[in-house]
Amino acid sequence: MAETEALSKLREDFRMQNKSVFILGASGETGRVLLKEILEQGLFSKVTLIGRRKLTFDEEAYKNVNQEVVDFEKLDDYASAFQGHDVGFCCLGTTRGKAGAEGFVRVDRDYVLKSAELAKAGGCKHFNLLSSKGADKSSNFLYLQVKGEVEAKVEELKFDRYSVFRPGVLLCDRQESRPGEWLVRKFFGSLPDSWASGHSVPVVTVVRAMLNNVVRPRDKQMELLENKAIHDLGKAHGSLKP
């Protein structure tokens, strides 16, 4: 009960600050759930989506969502889209299978880093990056290497606060079909919770961890949340719609 009350108080205090937020990658699974949860919790006075195309929503709750359409190959021409946001969430990402090796690096490293640079220049104070369990710039695996590289590069920008989330396998029902992922999700879903939670995490838990974290005051400039910490924070009492 005390934890629930404390979290509710943190949220209320955060709302009173009338902060603005942008989301990169709102068309993806994590970004889509993040947007939904942000609107349900009402944490921000202004919500902006930055993406390569305008998204369509039928629900009334989305009517005040702002959208900035940009060309990620010419992001400098769209610097204004990144101006005036207090908080940023970056959920950009693709796969080597979908985009090829060069395309994957371009999206997951180059687009993310350039977006972070423009966000910093535009006044963003708290940048949140969705990365991956095992991210390591020295890894022999391209995926983990790129994730580790971009983590380090964004840290060099010296945001007032920089939060990196390293979830395991994301458990969700993708709108986009990715061969093999369905089997992986079924595999983890059949395992004991104690084992599966160390290597996987539901998308909604990641999103709630992000939002529970953003309302908590922190002295550290950089914070790294691994899969277990994401589970713990995402399942904190009061993490549902207020």
Curated annotation (Swiss-Prot):
Keyword vocabulary terms for this entry: Acetylation, Cytoplasm, Disulfide bond, Host-virus interaction, NADP, Translation regulation, Tumor suppressor
SUPFAM superfamilies: NAD(P)-binding Rossmann-fold domains (SSF51735)
Chief localisation class: cytoplasm
Record's GO cellular component terms: cytoplasm; cytosol; mitochondrion; nuclear envelope
Catalytic machinery residues: Y143, K147
A GO molecular function held by the record: protein serine/threonine kinase activity
Sites where the protein binds NADPH: S27, G28, E29, T30, R52, R53, L92, G93, Y143, K147, L170, R178
Tissue distribution of the protein: High levels in liver, lung, skeletal muscle, pancreas and placenta. Moderate levels in heart and kidney. Low levels in brain. Not expressed or low levels in variant small cell lung carcinomas, 33% of hepatocellular carcinomas and neuroblastomas. Levels are reduced in the heart of patients with hypertrophic cardiomyopathy and failing hearts.
Transmembrane regions listed in the UniProt entry: none
Pfam families: NAD_binding_10 (PF13460)
Subunit structure: Monomer. Forms homodimers during oxidative stress. Interacts (via N-terminus) with elongation factor EEF1A1 (via middle-region); the interaction is direct and competes with EEF1A1 binding to guanyl-nucleotide exchange factor EEF1B2, thereby inhibiting GDP for GTP exchange and reactivation of EEF1A1. Interacts with nuclear transport receptors XPO4, IPO5/RANBP5, IPO7, IPO9 and KPNB1 as well as GCN1L1/GCN1 and LRPPRC probably through their HEAT repeats. Binds NCOA5/CIA.
Record function comment: Represses translation by preventing reactivation of elongation factor eEF1A. May also inhibit nuclear import by competing with nuclear import substrates for binding to a subset of nuclear transport receptors. Has additionally been proposed to act as a redox sensor involved in cellular oxidative stress surveillance.
Protein name: Protein HTATIP2
Naturally occurring in which organism (per UniProt): Homo sapiens (Human)
Gene behind the chain: HTATIP2
